[in-house]
Regions:
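Substrate-binding pocket helix/loop in short-chain dehydrogenase/reductase
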Residues: 98-117, 228
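Short C-terminal tail/terminal secondary-structure segment
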Residues: 2-6, 156, 236, 246-248, ...
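Residue(s) in the substrate-gating loop at a strand-loop-helix junction
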Residues: 151
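Canonical Rossmann dinucleotide-binding motif of NAD(H)/NADP(H)-dependent dehydrogenases/reductases
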Residues: 4-37
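Short, small/polar-rich loop/turn modules that mediate ligand/substrate recognition or access, typified
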Residues: 183, 188, 258-260
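Active-site helix of classical SDR
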Residues: 131, 167, 175
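Alpha-helical segment proximal to the catalytic Tyr-Lys
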Residues: 136, 180-181, 256
Length: 272
């Protein structure tokens, strides 16, 4: 039976697909009949539930910051599935830090050139390289969808995460600008900006320690904030599947006239 989204036979490329949002998105594509190319730096292929899935999976270790790695991935994907239809630009990193740390100038949690270069390389350069490589395929084929994963931080800014927020704002600008360039070729470009979620691949202990330091709170208080009951009108954190549901809809032909916009998935917390 064909699903309402009708993704049977489509091929989606998902970066950062070994964990968190990316893995949930990849699994959802598989469950809805799409073939999926999962790209990630993790040398160990993650486990997916393929038993009930109608789509096929290809895992390719990919460094999205290196053009040659991206090109090699595209060639492997085409060899496996032929036509490529969807790109989910999900790969990203977040290293919390302060612009100025009066308690420890130029210390561990103050923004450095190394951190700046690392975060912008993945979150901006990686998005551009993937979009350009798949964009060539989509323009040549006369159709395609690019979905750029942003964040509520990119819309509102975020204490202790200024460089991450800046990169996500750049991604929002990519979405708007590329939509003006690629629409004439029947290539849609849209964005998704999640708010606080129950769990993501970014939330390690080191991340929590860094973010709690930049905000002057304990890790325990930070974790209480994940529940998000007071700051979000819906009174809870989001689920990874709720993000994936929107991604799948935007990737489908049901969203064929949606182009050049970034959608919030933040329980009403973020607007704009």
């Amino acid at each position: 039976m064909t699903s309402w989204l009708n993704l049977e036979g489509k091929t989606a490329v998902v970066t950062g697909g070994a964990s968190g949002i990316g893995k949930t998105v990849a699994q959802s594509f598989l469950d809805n009949g799409a073939n999926v190319v999962v790209c990630d730096m993790n040398p160990d292929e993650p486990e997916f539930e393929l038993g009930g899935s109608r789509g096929k999976l290809l895992y390719v270790v990919t460094d999205v910051t290196k053009a040659e790695s991206v090109t090699a991935m595209v060639e492997k994907a085409k060899a496996a599935f032929g036509k490529l239809d969807i790109l989910v630009n999900n790969a990203g990193i977040n290293i919390p830090c302060l612009l100025v740390d009066p308690k420890d100038p130029h210390g561990k949690y103050e923004l450095s050139e190394r951190v700046y270069d690392k975060v912008t390389s993945v979150n901006i350069k990686g998005v551009y390289l993937m979009a350009q490589a798949l964009g060539h395929e989509f323009v040549r084929n006369g159709s395609g969808v690019i979905i750029n994963m942003s964040s509520e931080s990119g819309l509102e800014g975020s204490e202790g995460q200024s460089i991450y927020a800046a990169t996500k704002n750049a991604v929002n600008s990519f979405t708007r600008s590329w939509s003006k360039e690629l629409g004439r070729y029947n290539v849609r470009v849209v964005g998704v900006a999640p708010g606080i979620l129950e769990a993501t691949g970014l939330r390690t202990l080191a991340y929590e320690e860094a973010l709690s330091y930049t905000r002057g709170i304990t890790v325990e208080d930070l974790r209480k904030g994940y529940k998000n009951t007071k700051t979000t009108p819906l009174g809870r954190s989001g689920k990874l599947t709720e993000v994936a549901n929107l991604v799948l809809f935007l990737a489908s032909d049901r969203a064929s006239y949606i182009h050049g916009v970034t959608y919030n998935v933040a329980g009403g917390k973020t607007r704009g």
